[in-house]
Curated annotation (Swiss-Prot):
Species of origin: Shigella flexneri
InterPro entries in the record: Cold_shock_CspA (IPR012156), Cold_shock_domain (IPR050181), CSD (IPR011129), CSD_CS (IPR019844), CSP_DNA-bd (IPR002059), NA-bd_OB-fold (IPR012340)
GO molecular function annotations of the record: DNA binding
Alphabetized SMART domains for the sequence: CSP
Occurrences of domain CSD (ranges): 6-66
Pfam families: CSD (PF00313)
Transmembrane segments: none
Protein name: Cold shock-like protein CspC
Subcellular localization: Cytoplasm
Matches recorded under NCBIfam families: PRK09507.1, PRK10943.1
Superkingdom of the organism of origin: Bacteria
UniProt cross-references to CDD domains, sorted A to Z: CSP_CDS
A cellular component annotation (GO) from this entry: cytosol
Keywords: Activator, Cytoplasm, DNA-binding, Transcription, Transcription regulation
Amino acid sequence: MAKIKGQVKWFNESKGFGFITPADGSKDVFVHFSAIQGNGLKTLAEGQNVEFEIQDGQKGPAAVNVTAI
């Protein structure tokens, strides 16, 4: 899978999910905290730049292997 660059639109820490806006302008992608790579607290900040892959989830496309850049 190719890595896609994007920016965090919003992320709700208490609920553990949010959305990423891909840099290519395509539709926002759902992200769950379990898809965030790294140690410690798995959260994202609004406006943070990330790289990710897209996988089909239960409710449509979802980001996986999310890393901050």
